Design a protein with these regions (language model features):
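Basic side chains
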Residues: 3-5, 88, 121, 212-213, ...
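N-terminal type II signal-anchor transmembrane helix
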Residues: 1-35
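Signal peptide-directed extracytoplasmic domains
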Residues: 21, 27-185
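Bacterial extracytoplasmic/cell-wall-associated proteins, especially those involved in peptidoglycan
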Residues: 127-131, 142-292
Length: 292
């Protein structure tokens, strides 16, 4: 047997051995868990290996490390959030990352009062930077496509659990929230708001005040009714939560005359301004909107 044939045979044997190792499990999650989640921010191989090495459940041995480095010569790894099942082989893991077969995350938020808080909550769960989200919320030309402006946009967000991709773009994220908003405002809900002589936006603003007043569900319709009556007769709402919002100090437990006077020119102060504030003072719960 000549040297060339011997070399080819050795290469084939080594390839077969490497392939057999590629088929072995690379993921072994903790007892009681069924999966591990891996976040990939970019296609950089070293950054990817660092992420993998940080996961105790992933066995980053020579086979996996070599497979990733060899694959990176010909293919790129797609950013995203990937669920790795217990017992997943090296080959399946690498293929999933190369083909970008990412898995959606569950995005949630509640008890949000300001745009800054919302941007922070969302960015903590997504690849997006809070500034990227803030830029959309402050751009009237972008918001116009959703029938919103910088004052009304916070009413588009509804506390819920949303399935989105971790590396979702700002415009796609807004599309997701807008779709949920449109689905929520059914004909029945719109008719109810119309019967109360308010718009869906006004109902949401009023609900944000009611949400600040109480968390006890049986009280919500009563509080909403009280404010609706004041609204319809042209009386100032005199809602303490609006003054708290105007001060920007959400730790306040009691609103005094000093707080009211200090914010008297603020349009959110319903002690000094007739009607509803120009926007929500928090993102209200769906149940509170339904109570209006």
């Amino acid at each position: 047997m000549n040297k060339t044939k011997i070399l080819i045979l050795c290469v084939c044997v080594l390839a077969a051995i490497f392939l057999s190792f590629m088929l072995l499990p690379a993921v072994s999650v903790a007892e009681g868990e069924s999966e591990e989640r891996l976040y990939v921010e970019n296609g950089d191989v070293n950054a990817l290996l660092d992420s993998i090495n940080s996961k105790e459940s992933i066995k980053c041995d020579f086979t996996l490390s070599m497979a990733i480095r060899l694959t990176s010569v010909f293919r790129t790894f797609k950013p995203g959030s990937y669920v790795l099942e217990d017992g997943m082989s090296t080959m399946r893991l690498v293929n999933k990352l190369v083909k970008g077969r990412q898995d959606p995350i569950k995005l949630t938020f509640n008890s949000v009062r300001t745009k800054e808080q919302l941007c922070s909550r969302l960015s903590q769960q997504l690849m997006l930077d809070s500034a990227d989200i803030a830029n959309v919320l402050r751009n009237d030309s972008i918001l116009k496509a959703y029938g919103m402006d910088t004052l009304s946009v916070m009413s588009i967000f509804l506390p819920d659990t949303y399935e989105v991709y971790w590396n979702i773009k700002p415009n796609k994220l807004m599309d997701k929230f807008h779709s949920a908003y449109k689905a929520f405002w059914t004909a029945d809900r719109k008719n109810k708001a119309e019967a109360a002589k308010i718009t869906p936006f006004q109902a949401t603003v009023l609900a944000s005040i009611v949400d600040e007043e109480s968390t006890y569900k049986p009280e919500l319709p009563v509080i909403a009714g009280l404010y609706l009556n004041r609204l319809h007769i042209g009386m100032k709402l005199q809602a303490d939560p609006t003054v708290k919002f105007a001060t920007g100090d959400f730790s306040l437990r009691r609103i005094t005359l000093e707080h009211i006077n200090a914010t008297r020119n603020n349009p959110y102060n319903t002690y000094t301004h007739i009607g509803l504030p120009p926007g929500v003072i928090r993102i209200p719960e769906k149940a509170t909107i339904d109570a209006v």
